[in-house]
Amino acid sequence: MHSLQSFLFLLLLGYGVFAAPTSPQAQSQGRSFKVERIKRGNSIHGPTALRRAYRKFGIVPTTFGVDLSDFVPFNTTSISGTAANLVTDVQEPEQTGAVSAQSVQNDAAFVSPVTIGGQKIVMNFDTGSADFWVMNTELPASAQVGHTVFDPSKSSTFKKMEGATFEIKYGDSSFANGGVGTDTVDIGGATVTGQAIGIPTSVSNSFVEDTYSNGLVGLGFSSLNTVQPQQQKTFFDNIADSLDKPVMTAHLKSDGVGEYEFGIIDQTKYQGDMINVTVDSSGGFWQFQSAHYKVGDGPIQTIQNNAVAIADTGTSLMLLDDTVVNAYYAQVKGAQYASSAGGYIYPCNTELPNLAVAVGAKHLATVPGTFLDFAEVGINKTTGQTVCFGGIQSNQGTSMQILGDVFLKAFFVVFDLRGPSIGLASPK
């Protein structure tokens, strides 16, 4: 159990401490359901996680630092496993309606089995997007290798949406696009009939190579959905009215079993008070004010730019304003920016300070330094020390900060469509 002191919430003002087709139909037994997550023990690669985050939000790196001659990167071929073989690890206790959600590459990504038209597909739950799309048999055969693909022809409930298309395109020209259909989707025993699903006929190599996941379940706001000519609702929006409460909770612990849970806020999963902050959903993200930060025992500082943040389960790292990143690594012994790694690195035996970031206008949420040590990345040629890649990296001056799984797994998090709002509490 985490100690309450490890997950402090500071009151900023007083510095007090407290921790278009037929409308989709939803069916949810018990009016709540959960998607469990089980830890895996594979290796991770920090620069890859950072590149994926940059690709997702169209961020172009501009920072330069030490080059490849300063350290020897580890060979990333040690990363093994595919989304196809993750399905065999799934457990489905009938009495709870629970399904497994695996953390792959030591928390580099969280994936979960989803049933589409009777076919079980491992996918990524992503609060930073709003499209439900899946790798499928309409893609070229070469793009299907290593993936578990959805076959529309084998689903008796699949219906093509004539004239409808979707397109996800990122700043570096990564993409997925194609047609759209509807089908019955089951997640943890909760079923939506007529869920809109992107059926790409073309995807970029970045999606082909990501064999840990076969698609995305977008859990952002439906205004972010890319389906044309008429936007479609997310799975969360479609299931919301059938739930006891229109909420999703994320309990993404790094040291054991955790879960996503819909329809209920389980008070046995957290301790102490929960803070709730207003979300600005106008851009389609779970976005809130985040204008302050605090490194270790230092003073509370103000961020002049990028004073908003989003909570994003589809991103591994914390991508923060350069002011925060530079101030943080100034307190990390031996830290330096490495252009070959794409971010800040430091000797792995360095003890990292805690980092507190503002959540809303009144509160700071503290992430323990142990959570911010993301991955080993190589060997220092001069000292022979193992070098690590930080879980905090630059957002390269973009308009928002991105709080990914490095942040989220430190808390019990509530995504609440009422308001909307986000709640944070210290997890048990």
Swiss-Prot record:
GO terms for cellular component: extracellular region. Keywords: Aspartyl protease, Glycoprotein, Hydrolase, Protease, Secreted, Signal, Zymogen. Disulfide bonds: none annotated. Residues 20-90 form a propeptide. Pfam families: Asp. Residues 110-425 form the Peptidase A1 domain. GO terms for biological process: proteolysis. Residues 1-19 form the signal peptide. Its EC number is 3.4.23.-. GO terms for molecular function: aspartic-type endopeptidase activity. Glycans are attached at residues 276, 380. It comes from the Eukaryota. InterPro entries: Aspartic_peptidase_A1, Aspartic_peptidase_AS, Aspergillopepsin-like_cat_dom, PEPTIDASE_A1, Peptidase_aspartic_dom_sf. It is found in: Secreted. Transmembrane segments: none annotated. The active site is at 126, 312. Belongs to the peptidase A1 family. This is Putative aspergillopepsin A-like aspartic endopeptidase AFUA_2G15950. It comes from Aspergillus fumigatus (strain ATCC MYA-4609 / CBS 101355 / FGSC A1100 / Af293) (Neosartorya fumigata).
